[in-house]
Amino acid sequence: MVKKMKKKVVVGMSGGVDSSVTAYLLKEQGYDVIGMTMKVFPGNYHDGSKEKIEDIMKSAKEVCDFLEIPFVEVDLIEEFNKKVATPFMQDYIEGRTPNPCVYCNKHIKFDAFLNKAIELGADYIATGHYANIIEKDGRTLIYRAEDENKDQTYMLYNLKQHQLKHILMPCGDYNKEQIREIAKKIGLKIHNKKDSEEICFIPDDDHGRYIRENCKKKIQEGNFVDEKGKVLGRHKGIINYTIGQRKGLGIALGKPAYVIDIIPEKNQVVLGEEEKIFNNILIAKDVNFIPFDELKEKIKLEAKIRYSAKGEIAEIEPLENNRVKVTFDKKQRAITKGQSVVFYIENLLLGGGIIESVESST
C-alpha cells in the first residue's frame, strides 16, 4: 500500500501573531508546514528599517523553532523594488496616492512568493490574512472574514484563479482575540505583539522622506493655487499631499482649506472648500473580477474607496480597456486617484481596480 503524502504548505512568516498562529493551525490540521520569510527591502539604520528586518527575521525563526517547522529566508528585494517601491514613488510624483499593499499582494506575496514556494515542492502557500477562501461552482472565491474589524479582503481583489487555488488563509474563521488566545494557549511569546500599521518598508511612516532619499528625480517645491489658478502660497512638493488633506499644509488663509486637486504637470496643489472634495463618479482601471472573468453589464453593488472606508451603494458599468465606471448613490468624501475601489455583493468579494479619474454628476 502506498502511503499518502502530506500536503505541503509554505507559510509567509512576518514574526507577528497572525502568521504564527496560521502556521500552528495548519500543522495541527496535518499539513507539512514550512515557514518562509521574505526579505523585500535592504534596510537602513537611520530610518529604523534595518532594525525592523532583523526583528522580523529573528521573531519568525524563533516561532518556527518553537513550532518545530523548517525556516527559510527568501530574498525578493529586486522584485519588490521593481514592482512595489518604484511604482509607489512614481505614483506620488505623478499626483496619485498609492496603496503599496495592493501592489505587494499582486506581485510579491501571491506571485513571486508563490513561485518560490512551488519551487520548494509546496502545494499551497498560507498567510495570516483575515479572509475566507471558498470553492464554489468551479471557482475559488473570497469572502469577508468572520472578524469584520480585521477583514483584509480589500487588499486581495487582484488575485487570479490560478493563484487562489494554491492559497490558504485559516485566520479568516477567527476574530483577532481568538487568534491571540490560541497564541497564548500554545505558549507563543508574541501573543500580545502589537499589530504593524505603518508601511512595512517605511517604518518611520514618512513617505516623503523615503521618496526624497530613494527617487532619482529631485522633488521640487511649487505653488498652492485656488480653483482659478491664483497663487496662494508655496508647497513643499506634491508628494506630501493627498486629496481631502487639511492638516499640515503650512498655509494660513483665514478659513479652512482642503486639497481638492493635484496637478503634477504644473507642480500645483489646488486648495478649496470642503464641499469640493465630495464626488460620486470615478473611473477605475486595471480591473480584476474573481467570481467571473469579465463584467458584461451594469450591476448594483457595494463599493469601498479605501481600506478604512465604509462600503457604499454604487452601480458599476463596464468600459473598454479593462476599466469600469463607478457611480455612487451618494457623494463620497475624497475619492483619491491611485487608491483602489473594491466591490462586494454582501460578503462576497467581487473584485476591484485602481482609481484613475474622478468626477461629479452635478
Swiss-Prot record:
What the entry lists under Gene3D superfamilies is as follows: Adenine nucleotide alpha hydrolases-like domains, HUPs, Translation factors
InterPro entries found in the cross-reference section: MnmA-like, MnmA-like_C, MnmA-like_central, MnmA-like_central_sf, Rossmann-like_a/b/a_fold
Disulfide pairings: C104-C200
Judging by the UniProt lineage, the source's domain of life is Bacteria
Q: Does the entry feature the keyword Transport, yes or no?
A: no
Known Pfam families for this protein?
A: tRNA_Me_trans (PF03054), tRNA_Me_trans_C (PF20258), tRNA_Me_trans_M (PF20259)
Where is it localised?
Answer: Cytoplasm
What's the EC number here? Answer: 2.8.1.13
Q: Which parts of this chain are annotated as the region Interaction with tRNA? A: 150-152, 306-307
Site described as Interaction with tRNA, located at: H129, Q339
Provide the primary localization. cytoplasm
One GO biological process term is: tRNA wobble position uridine thiolation
Q: Name one GO cellular component term.
A: cytoplasm
Task: Summarize where ATP binds, as residue positions.
Answer: G12, M13, S14, G15, G16, V17, D18, S19, M38, G128
Which controlled-vocabulary keywords does the entry list?
ATP-binding, Cytoplasm, Disulfide bond, Nucleotide-binding, RNA-binding, Transferase, tRNA processing, tRNA-binding
Which protein family is it in? Belongs to the MnmA/TRMU family.
What NCBIfam families has UniProt attached to this entry? Answer: PRK00143.1, trmU
Name of the protein described by the UniProt record: tRNA-specific 2-thiouridylase MnmA 1
Q: Which organism is it from?
A: Clostridium tetani (strain Massachusetts / E88)
